[in-house]
Amino acid sequence: MLTPSATVIFFRDAVRVLAPLLFVFVAFTAQAAPAGLDGRLIVGYQGWFGCPGDDGENKQWQHWFDGPAAPASLTVEILPSLREFKTTDLCDTGLKRRDGSAVYVFSSQNPRVVARHFEWMRAQSIDGVAFQRFVSHTQHADLRKRSDNVLRHVRASAEQTGRVFYVTYDVSGTDEATVVGAIRADWKYLTGEMKITQSAAYLSDRGKPVLQLWGFGFKDHPGTPEAATALIADLKAGTAGLAKATVVGGVPTGWRTLSSDSRSEPGWAAAYRSYDVISPWAVGRFADDQGADRFRRDVIEPDIAETRRLHIGYMPVVFPGFSWRNLMARRGQPDKAILNQIPRRCGDFLWHQVTNAAGSGATALFAAMFDEVDEGTALFPLETGADRSPAGTTMLSLGQDGCQLPDGWYLGIAGKAARLLHERRGPVKR
């Protein structure tokens, strides 16, 4: 087994060697994606970034700043490396780096931006994305339009690059009285009007398109166990006017015992166990290798035993690190505004989780997240040094913790994780 230091050296050299090939365009003819979650690395894809004027109507920065573009209103923790983009495809913030160069960001509304993201995934053999669709956004015409646009870009890019995609409904911030009804209505819209599951790239599993429900059962999220169970049942069976789906549950880590981050009402035990696949949210649940090892012992291994008993799938979550100083500072929560709260440690933290999960018998992984710079979990290319941050800001870079890494380092680790799963691809013994 590679030591942590050897792991760093291995990936650094591999990324440097492969870098010239990273963006080579290879034309793909869209064809049906191989079925099944087993043997896949799926990355979460927010697709929520925006710039004023990016869709002809938007007048605000979306997820880059809370207000005008200024150091004090910055809400992201680390900047993406955009050296492969033309400036005409980017947004000039008006800010300057410490060396005087302009700071650019991107809009997820730009199809060329999304296409490049998928080219990166293809170059590293990352299987595809779970596109995060916020249920609350589907209830507002302007926000739904933006989500629809990005979903179309995701579909086209996945088809072009031979990647897969599926939709994740995130219930965060949705009213409990409307959340289930909104999911029902939007799934009808996506499968009916948008015909999203007819894409050759839309992932299927067990003969049905994959759909994830994320957030039911968390202590601070909406939904009742009865309503969630009924929704899951209708989706699995294709009843109540809903298109059939294989339903993945993005659940609390305490789902099995109704403890920790899970609600404790008895009805949640049956709700969780009615999913086709369980994917417990692990981000922030531990901060170092020792914590990850305890998580493997206390959560992953018992979870796998339980899901095998239930004859359902299991897809653990891995993440590179965590930090949300700027976001929490803007929200007026200084006690949570901690820079580099969970250090990435040059990639060793992420790789340790990957080997833990695979060593426990997991055959699919969810990596959080491809583009989440708000909470510092992004896997796509990132700025490598503090000198690349806007003047007057406090931000992370890949140079944190004394690391000397290329900007695509974490794509390389994700690709290595994907290839590890591909080598083990096959039916799970349940």
Where is each model-derived feature located?
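Bacterial N-terminal signal peptides
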Residues: 14-27
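Residue-level micro-sites within transmembrane alpha helices that shape
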Residues: 12-15, 371
